[in-house]
């Protein structure tokens, strides 16, 4: 109860803060980064480099009301085929713009619903990608799989293409909650998809589950987590549902009065967290869990965990190139985002141009602030040695930045000459502590609840 009172006093239950999957966050991107800048950054990638590639497929058969992703519904394959054709054209432009010998350390298909593509289309797209950019040794090819939109033929196509990590969205297994959030997907349908994945020898399975959904209570989320544990995923993301109907209009379908209050959200998170830990998962960052042998767990132990748009990653590539509408690329120089609207993106590609419409070029200050935020989000610690060595700080200048944070959060953090650490009892405040290192105006955009 004392911890709850402290968390409340520090504003956890009222705050809205970024998830910090990037810094600066996407609302601060500007049109100053367009296609010419994107081409310059692509040209700077050295020959033979290993990069990551993300391909966005923005289509779904149905629109889930809880989802805030850039997606659109279609009952026909024709828009998907036209989009896949544009992906191939964009891929060809990218290959022409890059130095020779570039390989992939990670290939990820997300959406939307990538498994909406028919099997022959999957083979065509995967073949084109791997012809252009072979997989590096130890590379990971992952795809977001909708259990409602997968069959044997499509799973065969993915397995033959080299899929070695599958990701499925669960959200919640309670039928009443599923109906309210517009995502009906039974445990049996989900298990069938998992069995198809395992039967083909696909080594790793990710799953997403949400807390903070309408009518969720500790008993209901415990039942959903126990069903998920029966499927034995290697990695789990336990995300807080972000109710932002002013940004994601479809969320108006979800009754806000049925949502748990912030104290209830924390109880839901803690209930699920305790079950994952009891089942032998390692806790990764603020909201992920992984089997001890999973790459995320190994990266965390080695101090190599990183933050990206999917949450947490063990990918060490310096460049992530995003293909498709709304995709965001990350370079050592900054971020570049494609046109969010599918039509605008396709028009640019048809004209033989990349669709980069906005982004952000890093300043020196962005770099150290970004690294401090990432260090807190991944390791719950800012090490003074790193920032003195890599970012030009001395002990006094670093202390001027860390001391006010330590004073504000009291015994939720420890601070001394070696740096600043978030204590275990302070970890629910991690995003709020990270916000203290954010140099941008929080009022410029809306964000999700801090818990």
Swiss-Prot record:
Subcellular location field: Cytoplasm
Alphabetically ordered keywords of this record: 4Fe-4S, Cytoplasm, Iron, Iron-sulfur, Metal-binding, Oxidoreductase, Porphyrin biosynthesis, S-adenosyl-L-methionine
EC main group: oxidoreductase
Taxonomy, superkingdom: Bacteria
One Pfam family cited in the UniProt record for this chain: Radical_SAM
Residues binding S-adenosyl-L-methionine 1, per UniProt: 54, 111, 144, 328
Cofactor(s) this protein requires: [4Fe-4S] cluster
Listed Gene3D superfamilies: 1.10.10.920, Aldolase class I
Entry-linked InterPro entries: Aldolase_TIM, Coprogen_oxidase_HemN, Coproporphyrinogen-III_oxidase, Elp3/MiaA/NifB-like_rSAM, rSAM
Residue numbers binding S-adenosyl-L-methionine 2: 66, 112-113, 171, 183, 208, 242
Subunit field text: Monomer.
PANTHER family on file: COPROPORPHYRINIGEN III OXIDASE, OXYGEN-INDEPENDENT COPROPORPHYRINOGEN III OXIDASE
Annotated protein name in UniProt: Oxygen-independent coproporphyrinogen III oxidase
């Amino acid at each position: 109860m004392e911890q709850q009172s402290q968390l409340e006093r520090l504003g956890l239950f009222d705050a809205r803060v970024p998830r910090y999957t990037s810094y600066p966050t996407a609302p601060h991107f500007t049109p100053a980064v367009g296609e010419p800048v994107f081409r310059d950054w692509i040209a700077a990638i050295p020959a033979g480099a290993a990069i990551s590639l993300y391909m966005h497929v923005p289509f779904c058969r149905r629109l889930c009301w809880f989802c805030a992703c850039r997606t659109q519904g279609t009952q026909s394959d024709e828009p998907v085929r036209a989009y896949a054709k544009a992906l191939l054209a964009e891929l060809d432009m990218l290959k022409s713009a890059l130095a020779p010998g570039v390989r992939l350390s990670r290939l990820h298909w997300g959406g939307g619903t990538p498994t909406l593509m028919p099997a022959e289309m999957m083979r065509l797209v995967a073949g084109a990608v791997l012809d252009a950019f072979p997989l590096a040794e130890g590379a990971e090819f992952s795809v977001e799989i909708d259990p409602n939109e997968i069959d044997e033929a499509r799973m065969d196509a993915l397995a033959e293409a080299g899929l070695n990590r599958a990701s499925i969205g669960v959200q919640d297994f309670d039928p009443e909650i599923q109906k309210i959030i517009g995502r009906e997907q039974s445990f049996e349908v989900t298990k069938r998809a998992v069995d198809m994945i395992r039967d083909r020898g696909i080594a790793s399975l990710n799953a997403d589950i949400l807390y903070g959904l309408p009518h969720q209570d500790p008993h209901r989320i415990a039942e959903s987590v126990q069903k998920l544990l029966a499927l034995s995923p290697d990695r789990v993301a336990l995300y807080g549902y972000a109710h932002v109907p002013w940004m994601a209009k479809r969320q108006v379908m979800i009754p806000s009065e049925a949502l748990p209050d912030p104290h209830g959200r924390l109880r839901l998170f803690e209930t699920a967290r305790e079950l994952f830990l009891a089942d032998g998962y390692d806790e990764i960052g603020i909201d992920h869990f992984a089997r001890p042998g999973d790459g995320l767990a190994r990266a965390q132990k080695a101090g190599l965990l990183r933050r990206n748009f999917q949450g947490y990653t063990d990918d060490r590539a310096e460049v992530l190139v995003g293909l498709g509408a709304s995709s965001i690329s990350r370079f050592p120089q900054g971020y570049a985002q494609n046109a969010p609207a599918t039509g605008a993106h396709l028009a640019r590609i048809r004209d033989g141009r990349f669709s980069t419409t906005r982004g952000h070029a890093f300043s020196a200050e962005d770099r150290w602030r970004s690294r401090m935020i990432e260090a807190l989000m991944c390791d719950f610690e800012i090490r003074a040695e790193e920032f003195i060595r890599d970012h030009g700080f001395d002990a006094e200048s670093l202390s001027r930045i860390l001391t006010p944070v330590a004073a504000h959060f009291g015994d939720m953090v420890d601070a001394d000459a070696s740096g600043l650490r978030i204590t275990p009892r302070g970890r629910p405040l991690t995003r709020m502590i990270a916000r203290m290192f954010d140099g941008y105006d929080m009022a410029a955009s809306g964000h999700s609840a801090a818990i």
